[in-house]
Amino acid sequence: MSRRNPCKFEIRGHCLNGKRCHFSHNYFEWPPHALLVRQNFMLNRILKSMDKSIDTLSEISGAAELDRTEEYALGVVGVLESYIGSINNITKQSACVAMSKLLTELNSDDIKKLRDNEELNSPKIRVYNTVISYIESNRKNNKQTIHLLKRLPADVLKKTIKNTLDIHKSITINNPKESTVSDTNDHAKNNDTT
């Protein structure tokens, strides 16, 4: 009985050729180095899927790519408003990435000022505290915040986005001269060129 060479697709995961594949899929026939390569590959795959610091969204679906068409066409706020209104076919992951970008633009000190102006028993205080906690979480690890937002049920996520957008609008109305993160970056680039 002749030993065939191990299937290179089977070593790196799974062979999709079925019966058409002329290489060996029987692990008992494989030499030890081929088994070690397969074992190492599978263990790395498991480790990668368990690692929360890796943004699997960007690898699988391109969710963290800069040239996403929805965000380019609608802007961050437009993507979030479209998701709330269930228009323009905005996916949950696109909304979560846009929400993370909006959280980076918000300043928790401004929200704390709004919170301090409310009455003690106002239900808005809880909303402000929730948004502040998301801002702090996003500042520490924005990829983990995207995962947390994605785990929320759709109705809860929409309510959270709506509350955050309302706070964002009230801050921009109260402080119209306040520059956003993107404006600050543009000013820094202009200063470098002069």
Curated annotation (Swiss-Prot):
Changing residue 150 to A: Almost no loss of RNA-binding. Changing residue 61 to A: About 50% loss of phosphorylation. It holds the Pfam family Pneumovirus_M2. Changing residue 148 to A: Loss of M2-1 association with inclusion bodies. No effect on of RNA-binding. Keywords: Activation of host NF-kappa-B by virus, Host cytoplasm, Host nucleus, Host-virus interaction, Metal-binding, Phosphoprotein, RNA-binding, Transcription, Transcription antitermination, Transcription regulation, Viral transcription, Virion, Zinc, Zinc-finger. Changing residue 151 to K: Confers virus resistance to cyclopamine in vitro. Residues 172-194 are annotated as: Disordered. GO terms for molecular function: RNA binding; structural molecule activity; zinc ion binding. Phosphorylated by host in infected cells. Only dephosphorylated M2-1 is competent for viral mRNA binding. Cyclic turnover of phosphorylation-dephosphorylation of M2-1 is required for efficient viral transcription. It comes from the Viruses. The keyword Cytoplasm does not apply. Residues 32-49 are annotated as: Oligomerization. Residues 184-194 have a biased composition (Basic and acidic residues). Changing residue 15 to S: Complete loss of binding to N protein. One of its GO terms (cellular component) is host cell nucleus. The modification Phosphoserine is found at residues 58, 61. Acts as a tetrameric transcription processivity factor that binds in a competitive manner to RNA and the phosphoprotein (P) to prevent premature termination during transcription. Transcription anti-terminator that enhances readthrough of intergenic junctions during viral transcription. Preferentially binds to poly(A)-rich sequences. Plays a role in the association of the matrix protein with the nucleocapsid, which initiates assembly and budding. Also, can activate host NF-kappa-B through association with host RELA. Contains a zinc-finger domain on its N-terminus essential for its anti-termination function. Contains an oligomerization domain. The central globular core is responsible for binding to RNA and phosphoprotein. This is Protein M2-1. It comes from Human respiratory syncytial virus A (strain A2). The lineage of its organism: Viruses, Riboviria, Orthornavirae, Negarnaviricota, Haploviricotina.
